Amino acid sequence: MKGKNTVFFIMTFGTLLLMASCGTLRNGRGWGQDATIFPGWRRLGDVAVDTMTTPVVWVPLAGALLFQVDHLDQRLSGWASKNTPLFGSNHAAHDASSFFSEPTRYAYIATMLATPSGDTPESWAIAKLKGFAVGTVAISASNTTTNYLKRTAKRVRPDASDDQSFPSLTTSNAAVNATLASHNLDSLDIDEGTRSAMKYVMFSLTAITAWSRVEAKEHYPSDVLVGAAMGYFFGTFFNNAFLGLSKNNDIAIVFGPKQDGFTVRLFWSF
């Protein structure tokens, strides 16, 4: 399976690089060029509210709550892990979770590299480093929060192997990488049909990863639903708040290198 994942990565990476150019976005800026460590309190608040109120966040969270009714969580987990309708066995489902989650990581890296970030090698590299830093922090925040909740909740897994069931780290990791990759696709100069198809692939990889964890008897449905919601939240929040790709109505601070040191820029839109 790892070999197949490598092939998947190479194909995805190569295809996206063919789509890439050293140019800029439609606004004349490079992807990652305007990444900021402080986008402003108003911007942070607006993005947080917008992200929390999107269906991709609140629907899974609502679903996780519904699964607490009449022991639906335990009942579906028991049925899925016993019948294994998609993967045929708990072991195969366990292997599938890695097989389907790893490509989301590769897809994020590939789409990040494929985005237009400048006309010169220097500007391209600097913008990439800044943009990649935002994505790295998003992934780290998602993983750290997931692990904190695991230690706090201490929910025993369906197979009773440990008390780290809630929420699913594998699912949240797949979700945050898939979300970042999907946002990167919006910066690529490709037709809408291709963009939509690739976003569907990202969503499908996350969904299959989540279900495989349930069939593997390693998580309850609510574990993976919360994990998916968290991954999407952190991916979207950091992308929209810190990458500087959309209009910012608050003061922002941007750091950047220059020939003999660094520059600090203070700017706002009006």
Describe the residue ranges of each PLM region:
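Hydrophobic alpha-helical transmembrane segments of multi-pass integral membrane proteins
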Residues: 60-65, 102-112, 176
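Alpha-helical transmembrane segments of multi-pass membrane proteins
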Residues: 22-28, 63-75
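Conserved, well-structured interaction surfaces
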Residues: 113-119
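Interfacial/capping segments of alpha-helical transmembrane domains
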Residues: 73-84
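Interfacial helix-start motif at the membrane-water boundary
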Residues: 88-110
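C-terminal TM-helix exit segments that contain a strictly Trp-centered aromatic cap at the helix terminus
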Residues: 65-69, 106-108, 144-150
